[in-house]
Regions:
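Secretome/extracellular-domain signature
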Residues: 77-181
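Activation on beta-sandwich/Ig-like modules and their edge loops
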Residues: 63-79
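Extracellular, modular beta-sheet/disulfide-rich ectodomains of secreted and cell-surface proteins
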Residues: 1-68, 116, 127-128, 136-142, ...
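Homeobox/homeodomain signature
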Residues: 3, 39-41, 73, 79, ...
């Protein structure tokens, strides 16, 4: 995920190497020497960025990719959504950032995989600026199918050749076999 008002300042945020569901616990040296060095703290897995000056910032957010099954010919899960927007931010405003990470293999690595995490950029207590959904996990595939990628609407994709479940709607999770919404 990157934030920058052209061309003076550019901040690229990462998941800080975290693979845990709770997110990162510290910045470490991840941003040392970068434009946002010293402007970011972490609280409860959320990165808190203090805006350095008032201006228009271009924010690009990408959701985490899904994982793939052990026997999958393609070695990629569904792609996370990529969203870009311009926002007026105020000096010393706190922007809360959660960068989604890649999904994981399940306990039976041949048949289960996880979807990627969403990337969230919010101001104040929880006013969304950009939210980019993560891509779906893929069991066994021989070619890429767009139904496994994140959706840019408020309804998630069902997946490729999926009769067992459905995509989520309006922020609610999707259904699985025996647990279909509706």
């Amino acid at each position: 995920m990157s934030i920058h008002p052209e061309p003076e300042f550019k901040a690229v945020f990462t998941n800080l190497g975290s693979t845990a569901a709770g997110g990162p616990s510290s910045i470490g040296s991840h941003y040392t020497g970068q434009d946002h060095d010293g402007q970011v703290t972490v609280s409860s897995g959320i990165q808190l960025w203090t805006v350095p000056y008032t201006g228009e910032y271009k924010i690009e957010a990408i959701g985490g990719a899904g994982w793939y099954g052990k026997n999958s010919v393609i070695q990629n899960g569904g792609r996370g959504a990529k969203l870009i927007g311009n926002f007026i931010l105020t000096k010393d405003e706190i922007i809360r950032i959660l960068v989604g990470h890649k999904g994981k293999r399940g306990p039976n690595s041949k048949t289960t995989t996880g979807g990627g995490g969403g990337t969230f950029v919010v101001r104040g207590t929880n006013t969304p600026l950009i939210i980019a959904g993560g891509g779906g996990g893929i069991k066994n595939m021989s070619e890429r199918h767009s139904g496994c990628d994140a959706s840019l609407s408020t309804t998630g994709n069902t997946g490729y050749s999926s009769s067992l479940g459905s995509g989520g709607t309006s922020g609610n999770g999707g259904g699985s076999a025996g647990n279909r919404p509706g």
